[in-house]
């Protein structure tokens, strides 16, 4: 798989010279309904398929049923009409790693689930979960930025249309997209909004067309179902895939081990939403327990909550260091024993095994520092923000880690 986007080098010899339309396809009901309807009569919708590319960005954590529906109903449709289908992903954690073209074909046979690097890889390696507050940075990072990095060199500044699958209830996203657009020559097109099609109309169209209920497309660990009022449906999806639920529970549990505030749904955790007395919920919890049967690590975590020169809150700085590797129970007993001997506050989760010792708790007001030792599944890497140590020394006068664990 090529790791960078194809860029035309000889005008007149490239398949992209006449490209004038890009269709963003997120696999969900909205953009799929547009694509399926448009293909019934491309000319009537102002689309020249010879000059069009459908763009899909693989995040790596799409629900299995979405992938199956795409391969059963939509890929045959793309092949029938000879639609150019470009599948992309990030190549690595850093922007400098570039993007990977997973496939670029007018006869696509497979929907690629992931590329060399995924959002899950990123979240798991740093021990965090998506944040509910603010912009959907994870989507921009794994989708928007990836697509833009293919489009910009491919189009080379030529005028083109980019079709976005926002439904009629998402008028605000149209204005946000127009404002955020930075690619030279780009003009956003929003057909579902123009048609007045809301999400239900899109789902109804796909039901009539294919005889299936087309689910919403999003990552299995997405934090937004609760804010969209779709949490019950999301939990049902989890119950249908207990192994996936177990993995997401481990992701959240690890993140909360390093930061108790890292709950998947703001003030609520995924774990608390499962009732062990219910058989289908219990299956998810049992899958979670199996996920925890792996090497664990003892981590030293420090955070800085600093203010700028103008008094505004700066992004939180963090240092995460793996101190030891072993079994959950062994590491937990060690941390509890040492903490109690030194009079340090310690917490223990007897059900799933985490132990956490607070050397320094955060205060209520900024600036402040936080320091703790915790046990967690050994998936988190050593990572420290730039200039962390001098900033830590400046705020704390160098005091750190009074537990003899390192």
Report the location of each language-model feature.
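Nucleotide-activated chemistry modules centered on ATP-dependent adenylation/adenylyltransferase
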Residues: 1-406
